[in-house]
Amino acid sequence: MFLLCYATKKQQTALLFIYADQSKNPESDAAVQEVRRYIHSISGFKTITIIERETNWGLARNIIDGVTTQVNHFGRVIVLEDDLIVAPYFLKFMNDALEVYKDEQRVGHIQACDFTKDISLPDTFLIKWTGSWGWATWSRAWKHFNPDGKELLAQLEARNLTRYFDFNGNYPFTRMLCRQIEGEK
């Protein structure tokens, strides 16, 4: 996972934080070591800080810890998964959006990809959608994050919001949440 903090319009002024998880099992040791060799070759940022986990934290715990640590320190954060290729103006778009919506309490997350497949939409638009592929947030919004899937599901069901949560029945978020909860046991 890559976190960019205080990135400006130019990548060379961005602070890059890389969170590298440890392997789950001996079979993945070689792949993890290959990734670690690669991340040590990255350049082109003002600073690069690499956090290499000594044990396997798992995806959720690693992301939650990384985002929480950096957003609490910097007040905002841009998050990327490690296998993404971004557009040349990605940082400009994210930083501009973080600035424009910084005080808009109804906006808690900037998403950098569009799954709607609706070509009639403008280049930027508001949508009730969150995702993990290139996103950004502020400490004011992250403080509301609750990683407890059981609690979220209970709240959605109590308020009859599962269809709304599923993007009006267009995406199976509730099913994904139930699977996550099953995996938490």
Q: Where are the regions that the model predicts?
A:
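An acidic/histidine-cluster motif and surrounding catalytic segment
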Residues: M1-V79, L84-K185
